């Protein structure tokens, strides 16, 4: 049986019904080499603070539900292990989002941004009786990396521009738009570029690159945004040269 140790975890809590501002609470949690932060939060809720609020679902870094700040770095709780934080751990709600309660944030703008870029195949008239819509490996390679997003919101918590401008559609939405724009089956690029070319689109990004650094799926949203800027520049150049 693995040897159990104890770790003091600072959880920044907030209940809008009784608190005027977030405050810290400290909990002593037993752990071994396999204990994740999500396990620790479950222990706290079951044994120490039944009213602690946080999101979780799959426990396997697939659903993206358990994003939070760990020592000021956006992380998934299920992929964060206490063994790596023997000097202490501070857990907070994701940065740059309004806090609903404790570690739960309001993702409304995030979801609306994803919806706004129309994340689905547009203008493909192929029917089921025509068979599968086959792509070559090269065609799939253009967008495959950008299709791995799990909508966890870590890139928004990492993005300094989203922190300054909450209307910025953000890394995940731009990446998703680029994913579909690069899909050979899709014909909706013109519709999405209206969003990417807008004031709160790709040009709000100053290319810090922290969004790619914290991405748990190595999607590289920073690269997608820069490629989006290239496409936006093409649109601008064509519009400039087109006869009026």
Swiss-Prot record:
Q: Indicate which residues the UniProt annotation says bind a menaquinone.
A: 14, 226-229
Cite the GO molecular-function annotations of the record: 2 iron, 2 sulfur cluster binding; 3 iron, 4 sulfur cluster binding; 4 iron, 4 sulfur cluster binding; electron transfer activity; iron-sulfur cluster binding; metal ion binding; succinate dehydrogenase (quinone) activity
Q: Which Pfam families has this protein been placed in?
A: Fer2_3, Fer4_10
Cofactors required: [2Fe-2S] cluster; [3Fe-4S] cluster; [4Fe-4S] cluster
Q: Where, per UniProt, does this protein localize?
A: Cell inner membrane
Q: What does this protein do?
A: Two distinct, membrane-bound, FAD-containing enzymes are responsible for the catalysis of fumarate and succinate interconversion; fumarate reductase is used during anaerobic growth, and succinate dehydrogenase is used during aerobic growth. The QFR enzyme complex binds 2 quinones in or near the membrane; 1 near the [3Fe-4S] cluster (QP is proximal to the [3Fe-4S] cluster, on the cytoplasmic side of the membrane) while QD (the distal cluster) is on the other side of the membrane. It is not clear if both of the quinol-binding sites are functionally relevant.
Q: Tell me the residue numbers annotated for binding [2Fe-2S] cluster.
A: 58, 63, 66, 78
User: What top-tier enzyme class does this entry carry?
Assistant: oxidoreductase
Please provide one cellular component term from the Gene Ontology annotations of this protein.
plasma membrane
> How does it associate, per the subunit comment?
Part of an enzyme complex containing four subunits: a flavoprotein (FrdA), an iron-sulfur protein (FrdB), and two hydrophobic anchor proteins (FrdC and FrdD).
Tell me which residues bind [4Fe-4S] cluster.
149, 152, 155, 215
Which family does the entry's similarity section mention? Belongs to the succinate dehydrogenase/fumarate reductase iron-sulfur protein family.
**Can you name this protein?**
Fumarate reductase iron-sulfur subunit
Q: To which species is this protein native?
A: Escherichia coli (strain K12)
Q: What superkingdom heads the lineage? A: Bacteria
Q: What is its main location?
A: membrane
Q: List the disulfide bonds.
A: none
Q: Which NCBIfam families match?
A: dhsB (TIGR00384), PRK05950.1 (NF004616), PRK12385.1 (NF009051)
Q: Which residues bind [3Fe-4S] cluster?
A: 159, 205, 211
